[in-house]
UniProtKB/Swiss-Prot annotation:
Its EC number is 3.1.3.15, 4.2.1.19. This is Histidine biosynthesis bifunctional protein HisB. It comes from the Bacteria. Zn(2+) binds at residues 93, 95, 101, 103. Keywords: Amino-acid biosynthesis, Cytoplasm, Histidine biosynthesis, Hydrolase, Lyase, Magnesium, Metal-binding, Multifunctional enzyme, Zinc. Pathway: Amino-acid biosynthesis; L-histidine biosynthesis; L-histidine from 5-phospho-alpha-D-ribose 1-diphosphate: step 6/9; Amino-acid biosynthesis; L-histidine biosynthesis; L-histidine from 5-phospho-alpha-D-ribose 1-diphosphate: step 8/9. Mg(2+) binds at residues 10, 12, 130. It comes from Pasteurella multocida (strain Pm70). Its cofactor is Mg(2+); Zn(2+). GO terms for molecular function: histidinol-phosphatase activity; imidazoleglycerol-phosphate dehydratase activity; metal ion binding. Residues 1-174 are annotated as: Histidinol-phosphatase. In the N-terminal section; belongs to the histidinol-phosphatase family. One of its GO terms (biological process) is L-histidine biosynthetic process.
Length: 363
């Protein structure tokens, strides 16, 4: 059977509002849908199957009678169906945490069929839910999570992440590159879509580094996948360095002959950190860096690797790159550098016409 792209979606707090008083939807009066959930699911419907997965504490007991659950739940399902939204299955754990069952999220017994029969494609399936247990469920399934939040990651934003959006001009071929780099220390694959926004898939084994790479793509206005298996039992040096080399190569290949690009970029955002970036996709690598860090590590990432990452990237991107930042918090200083680099790169790769931005006739 062909593996499918499936969204495993939480119910309370994700599809419908969860009352903060008793955390039970046990009457029609309590049934309220999350903002824009129906338009969002309709947009996602052509690309994904839907499976609802929910913990319902004490369902079927005196504390939560079955009939009290059924009435609003059936009304919710009927409304979804009337709007063209159907779920392949609705999977519910009725137990309380103290019951220590095997089916309560983040445990995976409810989804055993999907695992044993390999019904979902782990590269294109997601868990969507508002709780940390939903994120943990995704980890247990080996897929990615989108932790729903009405402000930070609402249904409109989820659609933006899950459905890549083409940004290329109508008369231009979308710019894409894939680079595979294998050495004795690392095995890396980088895919870059310069004219597409959406969900980035980044797995290097270094959590903080993954987050920083995502900042580059997000603020750069493009999409990328980065997969790296490195010798992390030694340290993260080879992983970070080789990823930078592969990413720079992929960006350079995706840019092609650079015809029509803006080429130059400069950003100076003012936040709690003052980060500054100047870049020229000149075809001549040059790098200058100014930042001081008080700590040796931020999470699992060595602060000294920040400079080395950008130096390696500038070398294979064949770019002139100046970076500096000031601030009090090392986490924020490093993040400001990755963000400002992404924003500057966004300017440089923007297509403005069809002319080559160089008097030499080549970049």
């Amino acid at each position: 059977m062909t593996q499918q792209s499936i969204l495993f979606i939480d119910r309370d707090g994700t599809l419908i509002d969860e009352p903060k008083t008793d955390f039970q939807i046990d009457s029609l009066e309590k049934l309220q849908f999350e903002p824009n959930v129906i338009p969002a699911l309709l947009k996602l419907k052509p690309y994904y199957r839907f499976v609802m997965v929910s913990n319902q504490d004490g369902l079927g007991t005196a504390s939560f009678p079955q009939e009290n659950f059924d009435k609003p739940h059936n009304a919710m399902m009927a409304l979804f169906k009337s709007q063209g939204i159907e779920f392949d299955e609705v999977l519910i754990c009725p137990h309380k945490p103290e019951d220590e069952c095997d089916c309560r999220k983040p445990k995976i017994k409810l989804l055993k069929k999907y695992i044993d029969k390999k019904l979902f494609d782990p590269t294109t399936s997601f868990v969507i839910g508002d709780r940390a247990t939903d994120v943990q469920l995704a980890e247990n399934l080996g897929i990615r999570a989108l932790q729903y939040d009405r402000e930070k990651l609402n249904w409109d934003l989820i659609v933006e992440k899950l459905l890549p959006k083409q940004t290329a001009l109508l008369d231009r071929k979308p710019r894409y590159a894939e680079v595979v780099r294998t050495t004795k220390e690392t095995d890396i694959k980088v895919q870059v879509w310069l004219d597409e926004t959406g969900m980035n898939d980044i797995k290097t084994g270094v959590g903080f580094f993954d987050h920083m790479l995502d900042q580059i793509a997000t603020h750069g206005g493009f999409r990328m996948n980065v997969y790296c298996k490195g010798d992390l039992w030694i340290d993260e040096h080879h992983t970070v360095e080789d990823t930078a080399l592969a990413l720079g190569t992929a960006l350079k290949q995706a840019l092609g002959d650079k015809r029509g690009i803006q080429r130059f970029g400069f950003v100076l955002p003012m936040d709690e950190c003052k980060a500054e970036c100047t870049m020229d996709l000149s075809g001549r690598p040059y790098f200058k860096f100014k930042a001081k860090f008080k700590r040796d590590k931020v999470g699992d990432f060595s602060t000294e690797m920040t400079e080395h990452f950008f130096q390696s990237l500038a070398y294979t991107l064949m770019a002139t790159l100046h970076l500096k930042t000031k601030g009090d918090n090392d986490h924020h200083k490093i993040e400001s550098l990755f963000k400002v680099f992404g924003r500057t790169l966004r300017q440089c790769i923007k297509v403005e016409g069809n002319e080559l931005p160089s008097s030499k006739g080549v970049l």
